[in-house]
């Protein structure tokens, strides 16, 4: 149990690869991103969705990255899903069903969490642009293209 817990917390040390590639100073960790998604979920989760399930998906969707690392669309992602599934089976087999649900986008909760994933990226891009004077429009455009309403409007409102 002790070793498992320490491995999970290793996600705090895995930096978000997209921010590193973009040259962001002191980029967030994958764990910080998952926390950001969870906070957004608490604030934005529609009442018809199961909030506990949404939070579970937020917190474990990137857990395999403690083993496989954070991959971006610029990396070879041809085996990403199977590598992450294998890693989750090793790390926390009791949560493998959550990763499968998220990867397959099998429920309304999983679809919502995928939108939160992109929303968090877009909001974080705005934070970095403001704090570091960078052009991260690539990330903002990606987020806008990946989310539907009301999140697209929320991104627009936050950018103004």
What feature does the model see in each segment?
Residues 1-160:
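Active-site helical microenvironments for divalent-metal-assisted chemistry
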